[in-house]
Amino acid sequence: MAKKIIISNELRKFRFFANEMTQQQLAEKVGVSRQTIISIEAGKYSPSLELAFRIAEAFGVKINELFDYEVKETNR
């Protein structure tokens, strides 16, 4: 059996609680494009470790409060 890692995040929730920060505002704060933030929120793109830390720092939280991962076994 193969293992698949699924990374989930709470970006949308943290943006909402940060005075409804826009995707553009977060993107500018961490130095990426708005499209990158959209892709991360949608689970289509997993950020680099460095970017994940920059995003967590932007919200003043630890990385594990913002990102989580799950290992699933697949029948490959």
Q: How should each PLM-predicted stretch be described?
A:
Residues M1-A18:
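A short, Lys/Arg-rich alpha-helix, primarily the initiator
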Residues N9, E20-M21, P47-E50:
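Residue-level signal for the short linker/turn that defines the boundary of a DNA-recognition helix
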Residues R12-K13, Q24, F53:
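Residues within the helices of the helix-turn-helix
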Residues E20-S39:
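Short alpha-helical DNA-recognition segment
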Residues K44-R54, N75:
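Short, basic-rich loop-to-helix N-cap that marks the start of a DNA-contacting helix
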Residues E50-E65:
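DNA major-groove recognition helix of helix-turn-helix/homeodomain DNA-binding modules
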